Amino acid sequence: MPGLAETPEEFARVVELLPDEDVRVIDPWSTPITSDVDTLRAAAGVPHDAELGLVGHSIGGLAVLRWALTRPDEVARLVLVDSSLTSETGWRPFYPGKPGDRAVRALARFLGRVGVPQRLGPAVRRLIMRLGSMSGHDLLSRETAQTRYGGRDSWLLFWDELAGSWELAAEVSKLVAAPIDSVPPTSLLVAVGGTSRFTAKGWLAGQQRLADALNGTVEVLPDSAHLVHLDRPDAIAATIKKALPSQHLG
């Protein structure tokens, strides 16, 4: 499950390292990561009775965590890759449907109409790569980057995902705070390298608290910034391989 403003193409290296696994990467440009569980499951295209291993990066971590906590019988293994924290609840006036959200959406539509994303979108993508990855190696072709990040409605899509992630974080926070009857084996990968080093202490503490609540394990990645799937795809693949055999991985 990708994170905010990410694409399925970015996870190609992880998929390549798992040739014996049935890996499904949901496309956030078609199905918002903050969608309900039924929508996400349909987007993954897995059989209704299939038992899953779920992997989520950034806000995708919140999405798979909600899935695992609300439907524990469907999930056999959970991997959170530098997941957003349940404390990242944003500002309520900007939650979906609230006045702030409506104002930002109107602005994003206007910028799309006058061509701002079309001109600046690919540059924003390059900035994301520079700040979020130590390797800085972008797996997207220029054409794909232009199509996705230079799309008229791309900034509206990014905002909708961000605002939706705040609401999702608030929901998952309540789930984590409540007594947890059942949770699948959970692994957390935490990036503290590159630009992530500036907030590493607090970030790692938050991730450890989340791991404690889930009875999960934490692996710290000092050689990776936030975009772990670009810097350390091998670490993600190795953690996934510890999952129960013959699982669908979404």
Where are these regions (language model features)?
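Flexible "cap/lid" loop of the alpha/beta hydrolase fold
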Residues: L78-V116
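Conserved HGGG/HGGXW glycine-rich cap/lid loop of the alpha/beta-hydrolase fold
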Residues: M1-P32, T70
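Conserved serine/cysteine hydrolase catalytic core
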Residues: Q146-V220
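Short N-terminal helix/helix-N-cap motif within the alpha/beta-hydrolase-1
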Residues: P8-E10, I33-T34, E88-T89, H229
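Residue in the alpha/beta-hydrolase core beta-strand immediately N-terminal to the catalytic nucleophile
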Residues: G53, A76-V79
